């Protein structure tokens, strides 16, 4: 069974995995290590936790695959990031850099209801 709540760090790993698969077709631990600027040991630990929670499958030193639940969770985090960035840029008139930095922080803690309301606000 998949535990719905992940730490912000694990959500960042999922987001990184998803984006790499979308952009390059595959992802390995070394790619994640470089992109997130973390040690290979940290990546291995995160991958083990994500696999145990049912979000990914992976082979040591091999490809990392997102399972359906991992894809769904990744897409949710990415959507939150995009909506928040849009809000900060278009409504609050923040620079892209500042909007992105704030979206990265808030995407992990915004409640589902607040996100739905924000999304509705931007779509009106």
Regions inferred by a protein language model and the residue ranges of each:
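Basic, amphipathic "hinge/linker" alpha-helix immediately C-terminal to the N-terminal HTH DNA-binding motif
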Residues: 62-81
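Short amphipathic alpha-helical/adjacent loop interface patches that line ligand
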Residues: 10, 81, 103
